[in-house]
């Protein structure tokens, strides 16, 4: 069984099965109430004035709905959604090609916008403010600058690392928000909605148990539901109750706090090799065979939220709760 279930589902592109599960409007977007309310005002005001929607920046851990919100924006404004990501736009010409193809009102979604090349980012400033691009043609004594006018568009940026965005870029967004982890009761509602779409038979108690082990993340919750559905199909006559959910999740080695084998390996390694810390992120990553960015973006935020890990000026430390959880897990 895959011991990296969480990472495999948070560090990948959206699969085709997820598309019909995505909310189509703000009314269907459950949770993140304050963000939803603010977006209703932002969208409603732009529509009443007949203007293009102001640029939006969504930050927060992976899997919480940043891409979904960008899709909702485009539908609310009755425009097209164009998807790309920071690492894909390597040079100014790549950006120019995307921007010049946009129609008036289109929503350009740049995922991992913090990974944009700095030289490319500088071209984006003018595009966001003036809807124009100054491009250099030729080189040497024949070099000259031409200005390309752009159709007015909305940039929707998404980032898991807000601190890596430059201030000039951050300040050009009219709407900024941070998505937070979801409450289990909200995730239960999302799972029950998903079960109706996928025609999965599940009771509310089982849905809540899956929600509790989903790290506060809708994407993880939906993938867990798919796994439990498959388990129920083979082992439980296609019906998911609490017992079936527990058996299926135990097979994935996902515990009652939503930690998988890699989460526990990280804490165990810190305890065994570094006396619980403090220890630097690069040392942790090397010890468990992961990239530092994966540790920071996928594992660390949830462990901190659960009170199992803390950041200090000298590095990361396992908390007393973290010790208790690892000791308790090893005794079960």
Swiss-Prot record:
It comes from Protochlamydia amoebophila (strain UWE25). It catalyses: ATP + H2O = ADP + phosphate + H(+). Pfam families: AAA_lid_4, RuvB_C, RuvB_N. This is Holliday junction branch migration complex subunit RuvB. Belongs to the RuvB family. InterPro entries: AAA+_ATPase (IPR003593), AAA_lid_4 (IPR041445), DNA_helicase_Holl-junc_RuvB (IPR004605), P-loop_NTPase (IPR027417), RuvB-like_N (IPR008824), RuvB_C (IPR008823), WH-like_DNA-bd_sf (IPR036388), WH_DNA-bd_sf (IPR036390). Homohexamer. Forms an RuvA(8)-RuvB(12)-Holliday junction (HJ) complex. HJ DNA is sandwiched between 2 RuvA tetramers; dsDNA enters through RuvA and exits via RuvB. An RuvB hexamer assembles on each DNA strand where it exits the tetramer. Each RuvB hexamer is contacted by two RuvA subunits (via domain III) on 2 adjacent RuvB subunits; this complex drives branch migration. In the full resolvosome a probable DNA-RuvA(4)-RuvB(12)-RuvC(2) complex forms which resolves the HJ. ATP binds at residues 21-22, 63, 66-68, 129-131, 172, 182, 219.
């Amino acid at each position: 069984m895959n011991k990296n279930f969480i990472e495999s589902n948070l560090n990948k592109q959206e699969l085709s099965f997820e598309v019909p599960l995505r909310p189509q409007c703000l009314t269907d977007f459950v949770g993140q109430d304050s963000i939803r309310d603010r977006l209703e005002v932002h969208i409603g005001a732009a529509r009443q004035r007949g203007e293009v929607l102001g640029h939006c920046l969504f930050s927060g851990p992976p899997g919480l709905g940043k891409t979904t919100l960008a899709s909702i924006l485009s539908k609310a404004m009755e425009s097209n959604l164009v998807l790309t990501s920071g690492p894909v736009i390597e040079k100014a010409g790549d950006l120019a090609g995307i921007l010049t193809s946009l129609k008036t009102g289109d929503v350009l979604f740049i995922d991992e916008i913090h990974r944009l090349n700095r030289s490319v980012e500088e071209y984006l400033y003018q595009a966001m403010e003036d809807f124009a691009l100054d491009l250099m043609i030729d080189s040497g004594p024949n070099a000259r600058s031409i200005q390309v006018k752009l159709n007015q568009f909305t940039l929707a940026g998404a980032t898991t690392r807000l601190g890596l965005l430059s201030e000039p870029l951050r300040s050009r967004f009219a709407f900024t928000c941070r998505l937070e982890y979801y409450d289990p009761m909200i995730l239960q509602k999302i799972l029950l909605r998903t079960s109706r779409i996928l025609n999965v038979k599940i009771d509310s108690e089982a849905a809540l148990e899956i929600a509790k082990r989903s790290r506060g993340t809708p994407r993880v919750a939906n993938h867990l539901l798919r796994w439990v559905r498959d388990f129920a199909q083979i082992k439980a006559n296609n019906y998911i109750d609490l017992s079936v959910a527990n058996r299926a999740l135990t097979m994935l080695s996902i515990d009652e706090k939503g930690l998988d084998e890699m989460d526990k390996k990280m804490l165990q390694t810190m305890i065994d090799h570094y006396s619980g810390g403090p220890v630097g992120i690069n040392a942790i990553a090397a010890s468990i065979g992961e990239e530092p960015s994966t540790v920071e973006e996928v594992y660390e935020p949830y462990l901190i939220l659960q009170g199992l890990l803390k950041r200090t000026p000298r590095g990361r430390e396992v908390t007393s709760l973290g010790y208790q959880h690892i000791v308790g897990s090893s005794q079960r």
